[in-house]
Amino acid sequence: MRTTGSVLAVVPARAGSKGIPGKNLRTVEGRSLVRRAVESARRATRIDQVVVTTDGDAIAAEAVAAGAAVVRRPPELAGDEASSESALLHVLDAMSTPLPEVLVFLQATSPFIDPADLDAAVARVVDGHADAVFAAAPSHAFLWRTAPDGTAIAVNHDAATRPRRQDREPEYRETGAFYVMRTAGFLENRHRFHGRVELAVVDGAGAIDIDDEADLALAEALAEAPGEAPGAPTDARVGAPAPAPTTTRDPSPTRATPAPNGAP
């Protein structure tokens, strides 16, 4: 791994999952979700190293087979209450090499991450246009919420002068597929959204997030439909021998504090 201007991709993949047991090892088009994430990152030309952080032996073995290094996550950072940020901070603490300039956080639950989208997002950060870039899908949805008394309240539109859907400016839904950020800014702010934040607009299959069996079935159907989703990897980097595992050391307890949102 280069010591200057390097880009590290991290795929958090816990062994536990309430929605779909063993979710990160479930397959789409014959490849596990964690393998698909690793292979997408390895096909991106601007990513130098890929690390999977996990508490599961089977996931660790799958990650190495896919070409990633592995950082073993301690139990206190692998529960439902642990945050994604805590997993990323633990990986950075565990590294024996100088820290990367740019950190790419990928979620295995997004099975159709396009390497070209990763490269474009990394370029925005490396070239100084943004401090953080994340995947988001356009939406023209009319959103509502309910008041304590059950009354429906319009959130993102005026219900009395409801415009045509096609006339509305799109809003954007965070897909969770990937986040690209300056490592220094992430360490300083301890969250992924810092400085100037930009969107990497994705749509269609690229916006899918696997949360339940129906999502998995949809992803499988898209994978089998010609031209609907990215196919199997063909890049020479994928399938090459795995890099040497990342050397780990005891992480600083002050830099890996869990936050409220659950980690993958």
Briefly describe each language-model feature range:
Residues R2, S86, E171-D235, D250, ...:
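Conserved alpha/beta core of the MobA/IspD/sugar-nucleotide pyrophosphorylase nucleotidyltransferase superfamily
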Residues R2-T53:
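N-terminal glycine-rich phosphate-binding loop and ensuing alpha1 helix
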Residues R14, P75, A137-P138:
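Histidine-centered beta-alpha loop that forms part of the nucleotide-sugar donor binding/catalytic region
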Residues I47, P100, H129-A130:
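Short, high-confidence coil segments that cap the C-terminus of an alpha-helix
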Residues T54-I59, G185:
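Short, polar loop motifs at secondary-structure junctions
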Residues D57-V104, I113-A116, A120:
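Short phosphate-binding loop-to-helix
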Residues S84-S86, S110-D203:
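Conserved core of the sugar-phosphate nucleotidyltransferase
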